[in-house]
Amino acid sequence: MRFYFAFILLVSFQISMAQTPEINEKKDATTIKQIFDTALTSGKAHDWLRFLSLQIGGRLSGSVEAEQAVEYTKTELEALGLDRVYLQPVMVPKWVRGAPEFAYIETTPGVTTTVPITALGGSIATSSMGLKAGVVEVKSLDELEQLGRARIEGKIVFYNRPMEPTLINTFAAYGGCVDQRYSGAEAAAKFGAVGVIVRSMNLRLDDFPHTGAMSYGDLPLDQRIPAAAISTKGADLLSATLSLNKQTQFYFKQNSRNFPDVKSYNVIGEIKGSLYPDEIMVVGGHLDSWDLGDGSHDDGAGVVQSMDVLSLLKQVGYRPKRTIRVVLFMNEENGLRGGNEYARVALAEGEKHVFALESDSGGFTPRGFSFDTDKATFEQIKSWSNYFYPYLSDRFELGGGGADIGPLKPQGLILAGLKPDSQRYFDHHHSDNDRFEHVNKRELELGAAAMTALVYMMDNYLPQKN
């Protein structure tokens, strides 16, 4: 009996090993160098981003600019000579900011100081006359609850918990305080607040307010209150003013509106696999952006890097064994409709996805990748990191893949996310400071090359998950 079980174990191990081809170190290192060399000398990502950012600009879901981006990227993918390029319809929310916002701090009647604000995505407008009220500063949703209706009713709630500067992973710092932005209005309205002001999700002190998605949950329409983000400098000024004068008033006016959903599209292009055409490997970013700035880092960079993966594979003459598909997702910022619809259609059509890679962390220097998979599979992938060491992008770690590819997870595939250096990302994120001139051409190209190299390795040595 022991011999029988030992035999079965040995056969199972041999079958598992046979499913993953033996690595050809010299050939793979040569191909990866060719990919990086090509990206740095004839990559297309920067030129694509220049047009997307400077000729089209911010691409909020449901906007004319978003549809222009759909047409532009579809045309550019068709020009690559891919095996298939098509649009996937998806219904998306339509929120319009309207005329620019205006706000001021009033310490005594007639004595005011203007501060920069921006309406949060999905927020309702103030009245046409604007909104002025006393202010209650809190650092958390818990503190809001502790104060209760008696302290909150009739006031503007000012959420002022900053991002934690000691966290080297700035995305962790963002995650630690973004609940104020997303859920703050819903929570404050339940205690009778008349409006909400949220400190911008930004580690730097500056005058750029940062927008982002917010939710009213299941609040009835007549109980919803306007919500805006204030710049970090403005937040510090408001906090300091309140500490000196609790009677300080805050005024703001915004003109945002929600409209019925409209049709938009995911943009998809692919190279069919030569050996396993039914096994699909996705690489993508989100085509929509906020309407402040031109969305170059979030996520124009991810869009053009993903497109360049297919371009670079063609330029180096590599014919993939599996189908490599670029997906430019619509509506990541305020609904995730594109990612959800892509996963729904994939399931309905019985498509087999084996790997998905997302770039949605800015166009900065690539440091490596995070992988959402089991530990045994990750250890196989981590053994490839030496190939990425010469390009300083060899930090492989377990973690999330990305918001748009997340809905594919039930298929049991390997998910991955490009991890650029994050220290400057939130200087730009969701603000008018996210502009083309802040993207370094070489850093952008290195990211596209690293993604292409990982896709190449996955295509050749896809680990067989247990």
Q: Where are the language model's segments positioned?
A:
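N-terminal capping segment at the start of a domain
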Residues: I23, K27-S63, F208-G212, Y216, ...
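Active-site-adjacent substrate-binding region
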Residues: A189, G195, R199-S200, P220, ...
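Bacterial Sec-dependent N-terminal signal peptides
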Residues: M1-E22
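Second-shell loop/turn segments in exported
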Residues: I32-L40, L54-V64, A133-E137, N169-A185, ...
